[in-house]
A protein has these predicted regions:
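A cross-family phosphate/adenosyl-ligand binding-site feature
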Residues: 1-86, 93-144
Length: 144
């Protein structure tokens, strides 16, 4: 079983209705949702699941997480989690290789978080290199 937390940027690529339809799940996205927060929902989402997977993990969310920022529901749940986070990076090869991103990756690994990927391959920008999002089946295999 799983829960979905979508960031504001998620909805630039996929609509909330489509995400709920294909997942057949409620999609959480608002940090200050009154109904959810009556029961401290961000803590429940962070702790009531066996695994937490960030898919895809942009340079932005990796950097914010490494610095402990909690400016949306996803990051707040990641910080509140009592387990390692599984992070699947997806970005341009130059972004992935940037020393600032690599320092944040190192810091998160030192704190016990796991990185799944990125793969080498064709990137969304048309280039080839490291930074490609791993296939969903790879995430499932890593979590077994």
């Amino acid at each position: 079983d799983f829960e979905i937390i979508a960031t504001k940027n998620t909805y630039e690529f996929i609509s909330p209705l489509l995400l709920e339809t294909i997942s057949r799940k409620k999609v959480y996205s608002q940090l200050f949702d009154l109904d959810m927060e009556k029961n401290i929902g961000h803590i429940r989402l962070a702790r009531d699941n066996t695994h937490i997977v960030v898919y895809p993990a942009t340079a932005n969310i990796i950097s914010k997480f490494a610095q402990g920022l909690c400016d949306d529901l996803a990051l707040t749940c990641m910080i509140a989690a009592n387990k390692p986070i599984n992070i699947a990076p997806a970005m341009n090869k130059e972004m992935w290789d940037n020393s600032l991103i690599q320092n944040n990756v190192k810091l998160l690994r030192e704190h016990g978080h796991n990185f799944i990927g990125p793969d080498d391959g064709s990137l969304a920008c048309g280039e080839y290199g490291s930074g490609r999002l791993v296939d969903p089946i790879e995430i499932i295999n890593q979590l077994k």
